[in-house]
């Protein structure tokens, strides 16, 4: 299979899975394993196509991101979504990521560990659906600092490949009495700085694996993930309020079972 086709397939996988509660990292590792595209070059490629998904969110939420630069609501202690909400949502995962980065990259980026993450994340999502209470926050401006921190703590679970950043943060939001749409949007916004930081750190450590010959492949993957992520996010927000997290959780469990039976055993 040509590199361009592999790039196109993995770009679709990244764009679909990055902001859905199904784990993009897990899917990239599993699909890469099936395609025979593994190793340091594959890891570097995954970093680059994540940038496409990051750009999609930055464009979709550019107005909200620009508004975070206004510190007046924060200084006036207004009950309005501001940069401190994002800080509380990001800080725990940044600390966890920095402390565990090398361990995770060395030991946890394996198909069998991803299967564990898929199942564990699915259990959390089902638990959140069962235990959620009536929401008190129906928009980002309703979000309290405590709710933001709670979601940020749940984001720490996403450092484990296969767990899913969206799955863990949206689950945390539901348990903190935040509705689906608000939890999802906050999940997207706090994913940006974490992903940019993690991607930057990975690129610094992986730049030696980059080659001029890889530019066409990496470009196809980047563009594909960008376009697919744009479409996936808009569709997901509409779909989530109708069906909740359980269908995604069941899909994760089914995927883990199928991959274990047909590939790992």
Curated annotation (Swiss-Prot):
Main localisation: membrane
Superkingdom of the source species: Bacteria
GO cellular component: plasma membrane
Location(s), subcellular: Cell membrane
Key words, A-Z: Antibiotic resistance, Cell membrane, Cell shape, Cell wall biogenesis/degradation, Hydrolase, Membrane, Peptidoglycan synthesis, Transmembrane, Transmembrane helix
Matches recorded under InterPro entries: UppP
GO biological process: cell wall organization; peptidoglycan biosynthetic process; regulation of cell shape; response to antibiotic
Xref: HAMAP family: Undec_diphosphatase
Protein family membership: Belongs to the UppP family.
Protein name (record): Undecaprenyl-diphosphatase 1
Organism of origin: Bacillus thuringiensis (strain Al Hakam)
Gene name of this polypeptide: uppP1
């Amino acid at each position: 299979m040509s590199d361009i086709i592999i790039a196109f397939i993995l770009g679709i996988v990244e764009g679909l899975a990055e902001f859905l509660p199904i784990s993009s990292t897990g899917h990239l590792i599993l699909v890469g394993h099936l395609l025979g595209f593994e190793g340091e070059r594959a890891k570097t490629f995954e970093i680059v196509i994540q940038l496409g998904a990051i750009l999609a969110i930055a464009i979709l939420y550019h107005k909200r991101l620009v508004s975070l630069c206004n510190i007046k609501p924060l200084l006036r202690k207004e009950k309005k979504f501001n940069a401190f909400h994002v800080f509380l949502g990001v800080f725990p995962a940044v600390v966890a990521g920095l402390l565990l980065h090398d361990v995770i990259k060395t030991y946890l980026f394996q198909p069998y560990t991803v299967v564990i993450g898929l199942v564990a994340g699915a259990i959390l999502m089902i638990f959140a659906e069962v235990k959620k209470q009536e929401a008190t926050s129906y928009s980002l401006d309703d979000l309290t600092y405590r709710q933001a921190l709670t979601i940020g703590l749940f984001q720490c679970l996403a450092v484990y490949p296969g767990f899913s950043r969206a799955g863990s943060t949206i689950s945390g939001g539901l348990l903190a009495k935040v509705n689906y749409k608000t939890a999802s949007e906050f999940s997207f916004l706090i994913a940006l700085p974490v992903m940019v930081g993690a991607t930057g750190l990975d690129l610094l450590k992986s730049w030696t694996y980059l080659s001029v010959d890889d530019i066409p492949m990496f470009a196809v993957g980047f563009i594909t993930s960008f376009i697919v992520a744009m479409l996936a996010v808009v569709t997901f927000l509409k779909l989530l309020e109708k069906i909740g997290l359980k269908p995604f959780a069941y899909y994760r469990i089914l995927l883990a079972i199928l991959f274990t039976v047909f590939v790992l055993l």
